[in-house]
Structure formats: C-alpha cells, structure tokens
C-alpha cells in the first residue's frame, strides 16, 4: 500500500508509543544525519526554525526538510565550511497503521475494526509545546539572506506551521 499523506499523522492524542523493546518490526528512520556543515566555525547569526503549533513530524518529512536546506545552502554558499545546519528533533514515536483495503470484495478479506491495533509503519517526532526548535542554521552576516531562504524552503516540507527566529551570536552583529 502507498504511504498515507502527512495530514493523517499531524495531530496526536494519548501517550507516545516509544518502547522499541516491545515493538517488533519498526522501520528505521529515514533521517540519519543531524549535524551538517562546520559546527566549530565562527558565526555571526543563528536562525532557528520554531513551531507555532503542536503536532507530529514524520521521519520522512524531517529528512526532506534537512535535504532541501542542505542542498540550498551548499549551492548558495559554495562550501559546507560556511554554515552549520543542525536538526534538533529525533523521531522517537512509532506510528501504527491498521491497513484497510478499498476494492470490490475487500470485506471478505479484512477484519474491519476487529483487532485494529495496527502494524508499525514509521516513526515521528512529537512537538508537544509551542515554540519548540526543529532545526537551526548558523552563518556569517553576508550569508544571512541565503540561510533565511533555506529555512523557508525547509519549512514548506513540514506538516505543521513554523516561523524563523534570528538571533545574533556576537556583540558586533547585535550592534548592527
């Protein structure tokens, strides 16, 4: 069966389902790299992608946002030494799906809501508070606009609304 749309898993209710030792067959998260670029560099600004609503972000949406932000920054800034990109959320929550068939004669093959717990199909990061940090980018002053655009493009890959917050890292940048 194909992957359901992200809107199916955006909202959550109940406790997180995270105990991997009790859950057989959890697929690995698509996102594997969380820190990219030169994290030890000397930067002027930090741009943060912050949530404005509660919700869940599936692992493939986190990976899509990371990939597009990294691709844009690498292209615009010519080198991965000119920025640091860090994804701060990890998809711990296991998502289940009770597969339903929608074709003629499917009622003979499936059980409906009997035994409807579902099988694990992926993982998601839960954002339970407003203003949680999803990812951040650190850049020098001359690359500020490119970093803003990269986070704007990355936010379009996420299922919940976000905003970009800019803060100066050193006193000279704060004075300007």
From Swiss-Prot:
It comes from the Archaea. Belongs to the universal ribosomal protein uL16 family. Transmembrane segments: none annotated. Keywords: Ribonucleoprotein, Ribosomal protein. Gene3D superfamilies: Ribosomal protein L10e/L16 (3.90.1170.10). GO terms for cellular component: ribonucleoprotein complex; ribosome. GO terms for molecular function: structural constituent of ribosome. GO terms for biological process: translation. Pfam families: Ribosomal_L16. It comes from Sulfolobus acidocaldarius (strain ATCC 33909 / DSM 639 / JCM 8929 / NBRC 15157 / NCIMB 11770). This is Large ribosomal subunit protein uL16.
